[in-house]
């Protein structure tokens, strides 16, 4: 199996066990990055949490499937967060919180193929985010 197959399988498993990882992602994210909590203080900001997690999953899948617009998704992601002064450390904390929440929800280990695939793909996404941040007005 390759990364796309492992990642799609993990998403199917999450659906089968009917676990919403969003609260777990943000619990871990805020623990690792408490300075981000005030950015989600409004009801509107809290409402987008699920959207952000879903967009992350979709972006990874789209990149793996070679969708032509996937590079634009990363540009949009960084641009959308520019005004919030989101730094690379916040992206790092969010990506780690996501994969850790998936790992725990699926009761996997760090060495399971699904988690290795997620970490590899999120690492590549992080590189693209960092490159995009370098050209934006947000602090790195």
PLM regions and their residue ranges:
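Globin-like tetrapyrrole-binding proteins
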Residues: 1-140
């Amino acid at each position: 199996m390759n990364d796309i197959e492992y990642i799609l399988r993990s998403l199917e498993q999450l659906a089968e066990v009917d676990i919403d990882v969003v609260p777990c992602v943000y619990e871990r994210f805020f623990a690792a990055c408490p300075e981000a909590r005030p950015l989600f203080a409004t009801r509107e900001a809290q409402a987008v949490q699920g959207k952000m997690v879903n967009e992350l999953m979709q972006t990874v899948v789209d990149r793996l499937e070679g969708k032509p617009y996937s590079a634009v998704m990363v540009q949009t992601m960084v641009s959308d967060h520019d005004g919030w002064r989101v730094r690379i450390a916040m992206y790092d904390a969010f990506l780690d919180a996501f994969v850790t929440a998936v790992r725990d929800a699926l009761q996997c280990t760090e060495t399971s193929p699904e988690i290795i695939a997620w970490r590899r793909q999120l690492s590549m996404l992080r590189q693209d985010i960092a490159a995009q941040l370098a050209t934006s007005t947000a602090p790195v």
